[in-house]
Amino acid sequence: MKKLTYIISLSLVSFFAFSDDEDSGGIEEVIVTAERQASSIQDTAISITAFDENLIEDLNLRNQEDLQNYIPATTIQPYDISIRGIGRMFRALGGDPGVGTYVDGAYSVDFGIASTDNGLYDVERIEILRGPQGTLYGRNSIGGAVNFITKKASQVQEAEIRTIVGSYGMSEAYGFLNTPLTDNLSARVIAVNRGRDGTIKDLGAGDDLDSYQDENYTLSIRWENDNHTLDIRGNERSYGRVLS
């Protein structure tokens, strides 16, 4: 059955900046931190694929399955990732991943959780490093590493609300509010609510199969002065799904 999807987006920004220069048509430079320092992707001596926020939006990347279509030599399953054939052998106790996953530089024990957090909404950049990365990333990175870099709070007053509706009662709502609190302190709140009715009818008293409900709330706080920057990020997520 054809799936119908409608997208409504509302963006509220305190100011708009327009460039007087026309688009030169050149290739946009992507800055990555794969080598623990900021550098152009063209100057990075690692086999890497990177998605900045504009590319994530243009390709409509919302989950790990979407990512797999654009990453060479990579296989992604619901909770695991393999690069060049190297991944997790088994998920039982002691089954360490072969590809390390990081969110803002912090190690994540589960790729599935990190890659579905916020539906890749409000993500600044995604970096996929292919090949052994033990020198910079330590254990569990013999196959490669994946970095998710989220957007940080800033001194810009801005907000956005975005909704998507479709068949089977599918509805998704995304939104954020970024606001300065003082000259040195700012906060960013992100809310994502996604859900869909089941696609397989349950003839009993239970819910239809393959339905899901996902609620995700994030608070990001940044304090900075001329010499130091401190970022604090907290996340609360509730996810439920009726498996078929």
Where are these regions (language model features)?
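Membrane-embedded beta-strand positions in outer-membrane beta-barrel channels/transporters
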Residues: E29, D80-S82, R125, A145, ...
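Soluble periplasmic/extracytoplasmic beta-strand elements of cell-envelope proteins
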Residues: E29-T33, S47-D52, S82-R84, G98-Y102, ...
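Transmembrane beta-barrel wall of Gram-negative outer-membrane proteins
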Residues: E158-E160, V165-R196, I200, G204-V242
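Short acidic/polar hinge/loop motifs at secondary-structure boundaries
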Residues: Y70, G98-V99, D104-R130
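A beta-strand signature from Gram-negative outer-membrane beta-barrel systems
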Residues: S108, L120-E160
